[in-house]
């Protein structure tokens, strides 16, 4: 049996997270983890070593950029899709500078 791809969804919006998690599970053989803030995201990253990170810009307390900076400092290699409802040029540019694979 092939290994399932592991995805970490880091978003504080519970309804959105449940909808996206269900959608991912229906469309593929994915194992989806969920984190609600930057600290929980970092903890899940180190515990489960996911292949993909779906990361919200507006996480409580420290925010998505804090997580990306942590990944960069630790030289943690992961495909990161940075999600934002505030797609300003500055936010998009900073996300890519910190290592985002894609910005939504």
Predicted ranges, named:
Residues 1-8, 12, 16-18:
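Non-catalytic signal-transmission and effector/linker regions of two-component phosphorelay proteins
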Residues 14-33:
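Two-component/phosphorelay signaling modules centered on CheY-like receiver
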Residues 34-52:
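Acidic, metal-coordinating helix/loop segments flanking the phosphotransfer/catalytic sites
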Residues 37, 63-66:
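Acidic catalytic/metal-coordinating carboxylates
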Residues 43, 65-76:
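Short amphipathic alpha-helix used as the core "switch/output" element in two-component signaling
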Residues 66, 87-104:
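Alpha4 helix (beta4-alpha4-beta5 surface) of REC/receiver domains from two-component response regulators
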């Amino acid at each position: 049996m092939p290994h399932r791809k592991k995805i970490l969804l880091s978003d504080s919006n519970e309804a959105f997270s449940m909808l996206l998690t269900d959608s991912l599970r229906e469309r593929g053989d994915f194992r989806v983890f969920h984190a609600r803030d930057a600290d929980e995201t970092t903890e899940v990253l180190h515990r489960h070593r996911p292949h993909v990170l779906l990361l919200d810009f507006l996480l409580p307390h420290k925010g998505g950029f804090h997580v990306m900076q942590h990944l960069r400092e630790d030289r943690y290699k992961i495909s990161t899709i940075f999600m934002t409802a505030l797609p300003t040029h500055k936010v998009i540019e900073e996300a890519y500078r910190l290592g985002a694979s894609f910005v939504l």
